[in-house]
Amino acid sequence: MRDHSYAPRARGGRHAGHRARRAVLLFLLLAAMPACRAGIDHLVPYDDSGIWKRSNQEIVEYGVIAIAAGGALWEGGESRLGKTFWRSIDSGVAAGLVAQLMKVTFSRVRPRDSGPAPGDPNLWFQGHGNESFPSGEVTEVSSIVTPFVLEYGHDHPGVYALELLPIYDAIARVKVQAHWQTDVLAGFALGTGTAWLIHRSPNSPFILQVMPHGIYVGLKKSF
């Protein structure tokens, strides 16, 4: 039998919540519009060395995913920490799916494939294989760390340091000419906005609800 003794977080009024959701959805829509690039896109000198090296970017991306998945399975969903882990899984999956759909829809050419310097950031809807907008990795990292910032930031301000991970990834992706500046900004907005919506939902976490009892209570109770 599942223990539902975990106290739910305080939530605002229903109407205020609906207004906030609409505001976030509008923000995400604006972030997804090609017209919002506002002239900030430009090709930067290629840099795949030091902390910006591609292998280090992959360590951050896969490390964040592994910690979220491992923490969710280990902790289960009966504690505040466990529920936060599972919300990060929800937001990571949801934001990742939306990002992939947007990539295929907008089919934007990556900076490294857009021609000689300074490149052409205006190559949208170029068909299969062009998936620059938005940055999937920045979307993924921001969607996974944001639930922890939202849940614990007020009590433990140091948690805000987690935001350095998507910021690092955004800079690194631009430096290796894999994304334009608006690609990573849109990815950050998409990941953060998705996590916020899931955090605010009284029915989250969602994926946890279809998990078997052994996963719900956490693997730690099996040892």
Where are these regions (language model features)?
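Sec/Tat-exported extracytoplasmic proteins
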Residues: 63, 70-74, 93, 97, ...
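Hydrophobic alpha-helical transmembrane segments of multipass integral membrane proteins
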Residues: 62, 66-69, 98, 141-144, ...
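N-terminal transmembrane-helix/juxtamembrane module of multi-pass inner/ER membrane proteins
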Residues: 2-22, 27-76, 82-86, 99-130
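Hydrophobic, lipid-facing residues on alpha-helical transmembrane segments of integral membrane proteins
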Residues: 85, 89-105, 143-144, 185, ...
